[in-house]
Amino acid sequence: MEKKKVVLAYSGGLDTSVAIKWLQEKNYDIIALCLDLGEGKDLAFVKEKALSVGAIKSYMIDVQEEFANEYALMAMQAHTLYEGKYPLVSALSRPLIAKKLVEIAEQEGATAVAHGCTGKGNDQVRFEVSIQALNPYLEVIAPVREWKWSREEEIAYAKENDVPIPINLDSPFSIDQNLWGRSNECGILEDPWAAPPEDAYEMTLALEDTPNKPEFVEIGFEAGVPTTLNGTAYPLSELIKTLNALAGKHGVGRIDHVENRLVGIKSREVYECPAAMTLITAHKELEDLTLVKEVAHFKPMIEQKITELIYNGLWFSPLKQALHAFLQETQKNVTGMVRVKLFKGHAIVEGRKSEYSLYDEKLATYTAQDEFNHDAAVGFISLFGLPTKVYSQVNQKKVEA
């Protein structure tokens, strides 16, 4: 019987390594796919490990710039903070991984793709909905969800099948990282009352260890895209990396969040997103300077929906594409410079300027240079309040002073 091909999203960890052997037993030839999303792994080692475990082919693709420009950028422009806190670190990478899985599957003539998600997390939904949107004819296999083994049973299977056991397997934490940040769950973090231990963090310093003097960074934007740091131009992926180091040194971007998962449970996770939180803060301030009132007040409603769609795995949905078109239209004049103070866990905007600034000092000032037409206020108030006045007159309402 001829073997079928499956493309596996491969991380190099125990789950996806065991999945290679498990899929072989199901009569599949496995093609491993590992993406460089800026997590800092030794991906050359991961690529070779997949082959040593049993994959017939192994891909390692650097997608950092694509991730930055096509995924993280939209999240920044939409100020995506799920439940007001989480910048969608993992949720942003899943549609890109799904996209590459489908591309390699079509390229290799595979009939299926596979991922290493469990049956109780959000990522299984994000992967599978995205894959269905991109190629509804591919079979999707979720080995970890199907085998339902305990950790001990999985380790025993690995030993029986000569699958290398990672040296950090005794770590209590489950970590996911990319350019946009780092997420951490499990272990002591499963107790929402317990303070996160310092070894749960990697990208940021504890406040007591941060510098006692602030650091200032000037971020330049062109049409909503961050392009410079302190006058130096960077590709977006490098700008994010550089800002992660700068802001992380000052403890910016630590987030402790009990969130409502898509699958109906609550989970407690710790995030580190120094660049993401700094850029979102700076970008919002530049929008405040350059967007007209009606757009500035309407945009948060669109942002909320975009955030929900991304979190829920609907990146490739028609609604998300339509809302993205609106978002892009709002960014045309979001060009300028924002000065941010990094200090003791805070990214504080202290200045902003733009050639498209709608702030007119001569209209805003209370000095002798004031050019605002105060006489116009009387007529404006009369017309603006007219519906309320008429309603009160008709209904014989009396307003007590």
Swiss-Prot record:
Statement: the UniProt record of this protein carries the keyword Nuclease: no
Location of this chain's protein in the cell: Cytoplasm
Gene Ontology molecular function: any one: ATP binding
Annotated positions binding ATP: A9, Y10, S11, G12, G13, L14, D15, T16, S17, G116
Catalytic activity, EC: 6.3.4.5
Positions bound to L-citrulline: Y86, N122, R126, S174, S183, E259, Y271
Entry keyword set: Amino-acid biosynthesis, Arginine biosynthesis, ATP-binding, Cytoplasm, Ligase, Nucleotide-binding
Matches recorded under PANTHER family: ARGININOSUCCINATE SYNTHASE
Subunit structure, as described in the record: Homotetramer.
HAMAP family noted in UniProt: Arg_succ_synth_type1
Protein name: Argininosuccinate synthase
